[in-house]
Amino acid sequence: DHTGAQYILGRINDEGMRTNPDPAEAVKWFRKAANGGKAEAQFALAVSLERGEGCVINLEEAVNWYTLAAEQGHASAQFNLAGMYAHGCGIMADDEKAVYYFQLAAEQAVASAQCNLGAMYEQGSGVEQNFSSAMHWYELAAGQGLCRAQYNLAVMLHAGRGVAADLKEALVWYRQAAKQGHAAAQYTLARIFLHGEGMDVDEVIAAKWLKLAAEQDVPEAQLILADFYLRGRGVPEDFVLAYVWFNRASSHGLDIAEKNKRQAARCMTPEQIAQAQEISRTHLAA
């Protein structure tokens, strides 16, 4: 199979398996194999054209090669092509076509495709809105460990969209997503523990999740965490850290954070303010 050999030569040059990577040489071999009908090469060539690796960016040609690979059943090509249709990259935006190709990839167990398809069913984009179908695809993607799908599934269970509200099950998925670093899931968990939704209030656990979300730059989490430090709720009282987090929240345009920062400063020594400002400079530069 000469197309297979051409594709392998492309991979060798692309990844530098035996030599230094040579993207332009890789594209040459990918194109030869792609013209011979090899789906993997068509996909690899499309990726190169989309990213401008070893060639000039050409989104229209990338769409053409993704389409040829997708029609041969290449799951990643189907997923990428769906994204091109969804965002109007290299082709006119078409939500129905996006749904079609996401569905093909989703049926081949591509977790991100399952999640995106779920979102399109939930929103009614390119397909009739159907919460049951949205849940189905979110569940499949969540079961594969995709944190975005775990969060979306939790939100639907929490709100009772298409199913009876089930906070207990929602919490399972919020936790799964939060443990993987999903900022919105971390913030939502913090609010659930803070308000005692379906459980006793636990400000210590709320503070734990607030810290994680705040570190990921969720402004509302930063604001609440700052207030926790100011009042010693769930964490030891610490005016310096209160000032730092009010400052972080203020940098996102939250006026109340700027006001609260000034109030916190009234309780602080000049040395504490200087320390807080230095920490803030380090934080904001990071």
Language-model segments: residues:
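Terminal, low-structured helical/coil segments at or just beyond the last alpha-helical repeat
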Residues: 254-286
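Alpha-helical adaptor scaffolds
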Residues: 188-191, 195-197, 204-215
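Residue-level recognition of tetratricopeptide repeat
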Residues: 2, 38, 74, 110-112, ...
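Hydrophobic face of amphipathic alpha-helices that form TPR/SEL1-like repeat modules
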Residues: 8-15, 44-51, 55, 80-87, ...
